[in-house]
Amino acid sequence: MPRVALQMSFRPDRPNRSTTIHWSFAVSRPESLRTLLLRLPPGMGFANSSLGIEECAPAVLEAAGPEGCPADSRLGHGSAVAQVPAQSLVSERAQVTALLGPSAGGDGETMNVLFFVEGRSPVNREIVLDGQLSGIGAAGGATLMTEAPPLPVWPAGPDIGLVRFRSTIGPEGLTYYRRVGGRRVAFEPRGLSVPRRCPRGGFPVSLTLGWWAVSGTVTARGRVACPRG
């Protein structure tokens, strides 16, 4: 089975204050990703977040990229590395943009999250991954679930295998806009808030990955360090 390593941090990391979640994972060997389930720490605050004021339609994202979507739909950004099977493994680097997708319902506990993955060399490809951030406010913590299709290098060819992925969820590097007195004014949105209390050893997090060609799943567990002071 592939080995998976998970890392997560809050920046800044003050209790009950807006933060940006930085999360990343690495896989020991290239495999075609099928499912991703990220569990956030219990107690993350969503009530005061202003992330995702507007929605981005998947059809618009596929046709025009993130630039075709409202700036106020962006949730985060990052990068990915995949490996392309050839005579030897060839690394493919890609940019990642996370955006708010169409509403998943009126319960207020689920958000659709779209990941736009843009690779340029050696394979020129753009992929939209559809995910759901659910269980917002749940005692056990919210979860981010994403599914990915097989990604062959060419028709009937071998699949691209994801080996590294990192992304943010939060205001770091984001600029939103609003109308004030008829003028368009830029502002930084509020992110999710760091839990008020930190358990001994840090906030528990986990990541479960599944692959198309591998039976079963692998779960990586970690801890986010408690805020200082």
Model-based region annotation:
Residues 1-229:
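Ser/Thr/Pro/Gly-rich, low-complexity intrinsically disordered stalk/linker tracts of secreted
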